[in-house]
């Protein structure tokens, strides 16, 4: 079941990103800005004139993304191909990378929370979208902010559920339920984070 849901959701995300990217190419919206020297991690907003905190925030984002990528490869490679759980070195790498991701995610939450709050205009835009009303917005950050908060929210159950599995007070059935929570919230975290970074990269080259 989890294998099928993972394949389906990753396929939908990939197709959605591809269609969205191609539609932007048709409108000429994905060309990099001219006369601008792009840093090798410039896609995350890195600039030489940033302060120390600004550079740390962007480095934390890169570290969080890379660590989540490592955890995704170790976790989903076996499940997607042979529907098997992690064992051996894959499990060790997954567990060893998790603290790096958590520390980076907490730092991102603390430092980006204020900038990612929804403005009055963005709240009105969100309500309009929920009511299926057409809204014309230019350079809206609504999707970027929503995916940021969604990823941060899913980080909590994804982390706590796997820690709780280590305690026997939940019983066998409870531990199986917690593993399921960890798997599905982890999948949601990967999907939201991937889409969030795609939106950031696309906005940078828009």
Segments the model singles out, each with a brief description of its role:
Residues 1-206:
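Membrane-embedded alpha-helical bundles that constitute the cytochrome b-like, heme-associated redox core
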